[in-house]
Amino acid sequence: MQFIDQARITVRGGRGGDGIAAFRREKYVPAGGPSGGDGGHGGPVVLEADSNLQTLLDFKYKRLFAADDGRRGGPNKCTGASGRDLVIKVPCGTEVRHLATGILLGDLTDPGERLTVAFGGRGGLGNAHYLSNRNRAPEKFTEGRDGEEWPLQLELKLLAEVGIIGLPNAGKSTLIAVLSAARPKIADYPFTTLVPNLGVVRRPSGDGTVFADIPGLIAGAAQGAGLGHDFLRHIERTRLLIHVVDAGADDPVGDLRVVEKELEAYGHGLVDRPRLLVLNKQELLLDEQLPELSNELEQVSGRAPLCISAAMGRNLDQLLERVWKELGIA
């Protein structure tokens, strides 16, 4: 499935039905009064969060969503039927903004949560409303009003408690694969992961915690370089970050600095988010090299790294123990 996490759509509420001019036509009532009914109201457009959806792909080819119009009024003061609600399903974690102003209209995070984004127009009035002492046979009626129409920006931000970050090829996908049932694409070259991967990791209680493997950042990601800018938004909701550094890289300390700089440049409080530092691929270094590199990383970041090997399954239990402690999970 193609992963789409941004979409622009236009929503339009239904037009209100017209009122009508009509008069009573009954036997033995030669001068029946006005009986024109009101038009029905136009239907609204409603967004609803659906936990079964994982992407905004449905909005790639359809951009205009219009609710049903109200029906015109009828004789005998019958009100026309109102237009039905148009309910549009979106993934949980979808932010909705007005496209022109950027104003946040809603953040749909819980399954079944709804947000009305365009109201339908009011139905017109029938001539029965205009009966007066001066005018016993009014022919005046009003037309229904147009519904609201708005351009919207939809942004999906994944609902994960733990985000796994790091430069390309640091081993993030391998880590989420061994910790959970996720099966991301894994290969020994940069940018293997082109979309965020979600995995559920079991807590000691048996409940699940969602981890997200975020595609590799590079220098300048916060300004749009590489893939990072497109996916940094997905760690905005996380409670904890796992920063993975490749022990076999040419300059692990420099790699650490790059990611920290990008988190700070992106903003949204990411640089201050609780974070665990993980030195992955420890099998690539000699035993005497690990302490030296660990000390360098701690001096730069202020965090003591945990040395692991995701590929060989080393120290993963210790990593999870630290995760649960940071999250306050028993």
Swiss-Prot record:
ATP binds at residues 166-173, 191-195, 213-216, 280-283, 309-311. Residues 1-159 form the Obg domain. CDD domains: Obg (cd01898). Its cofactor is Mg(2+). One of its GO terms (cellular component) is cytoplasm. One of its GO terms (biological process) is ribosome biogenesis. Mg(2+) binds at residues 173, 193. InterPro entries: G_OBG, GTP-bd, GTP-bd_Obg/CgtA, GTP1_OBG_dom, GTP1_OBG_dom_sf, OBG_GTPase, P-loop_NTPase. Keywords: ATP-binding, Cytoplasm, GTP-binding, Hydrolase, Magnesium, Metal-binding, Nucleotide-binding. It is found in: Cytoplasm. An essential GTPase which binds GTP, GDP and possibly (p)ppGpp with moderate affinity, with high nucleotide exchange rates and a fairly low GTP hydrolysis rate. Plays a role in control of the cell cycle, stress response, ribosome biogenesis and in those bacteria that undergo differentiation, in morphogenesis control. This is GTPase Obg. The gene is obg.
